[in-house]
A protein has these predicted regions:
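Exported/periplasmic ABC-transporter solute-binding proteins
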Residues: 20-70, 74-81, 90, 94-98, ...
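Phosphate-/polyanion-interacting regions in eukaryotic proteins
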Residues: 86
Length: 264
């Protein structure tokens, strides 16, 4: 009788220990909502991070702002499950204020700058000065820009300040929910403007370069844990990794400028 009870107890203890040990199937899957400007960085980080830490990353494209249903604020407003958001810092601040993202977890990850692209094989015009950029804008038959941070700045601030004339407004178009580079690659716009990190992954275009410093606007890309995340510790660990020196190469390769780590 005692032998039977001992065996039973041993089996129960063994089962309990086995159940407590994590298995590959139990590895958490983090849903990451990423805007285009930092998408290249998280895509570059993902393979090594998943292999090293056993965490699966489900990365979904989602603009930082705009009317499209896929935009991060609209997804969270609908209650879509997510763990991490990677997006334009100013747009993230509003999510923090609205209680959709955790303030304590918010961290800046990289700086981005606006660049111009043409269809692959087309001549690359000079845009090194504001005068050259203005002439290119006047001469181009069609101009495309995004509906996110860079496009809002271009359409509301830079272009109006350049005295481009009424005709310019008829040939300049804001592109929603699609990378500007793809529109240029299809030949639907002669030139396109977007964050360098958003243009770099697009096939079928040539990047002319950054617009001049006098007309440039830096955009900070940041990240935070979603307020209702079910994997808060794992989500925070991913953000800590992306803000560390280990991720610098991946961030720089994507077209963003990594931040000094003394500032973190």
């Amino acid at each position: 009788m005692l032998k039977t009870l001992s065996c039973t107890a041993l089996l129960v203890a063994t089962f309990a220990c086995s159940a407590a040990e994590p298995t590959p199937d139990q590895a958490p899957t983090l849903t990451v909502l990423s805007s285009g400007g930092i998408m290249g960085a998280i895509r570059n980080v993902a393979p090594a991070y998943e292999h090293t830490y056993g965490v699966k990353l489900n990365v979904l494209a989602a603009p930082s702002m705009g009317q499209t249903p896929q935009a991060i604020p609209n997804r969270l407003q609908r209650g879509e499950p997510a763990d991490v958001v990677l997006m334009v810092g100013s747009a993230l601040d509003k999510l923090v204020t609205d209680g959709k993202a955790d303030k304590a977890s918010r961290i800046d990850l990289g700086k981005s700058f606006i660049a111009m692209a043409v269809r692959k094989g087309e001549p690359k015009p000079a845009i090194g000065t504001m005068g050259e950029l203005r002439q290119v804008l006047l001469d181009s038959p069609s101009v495309a820009y995004s509906d996110s941070a860079s496009g809002v700045y271009l359409s509301k601030t830079l272009f109006p300040s350049m005295n481009l004339g009424e005709g310019f407004t008829h040939k300049a178009h804001m592109i929603p929910a699609e990378p500007v580079g793809k529109v240029v690659a299809r030949g639907q716009a002669a030139i396109g403007f977007q964050q360098l990190s958003e243009l770099k992954p697009v096939a079928g275009i040539d990047i002319v370069g950054l617009i001049p410093a006098e007309g440039q606007k830096m955009t900070m890309y940041s990240g935070a844990v979603v307020a209702n995340s079910q994997h808060r510790a794992a989500a925070q660990a991913l953000l800590d990794y992306m803000a560390s020196a280990q991720a610098d190469a991946a961030i720089e390769k994507s077209g963003l400028n990594p931040l000094p780590h003394s500032a973190h």
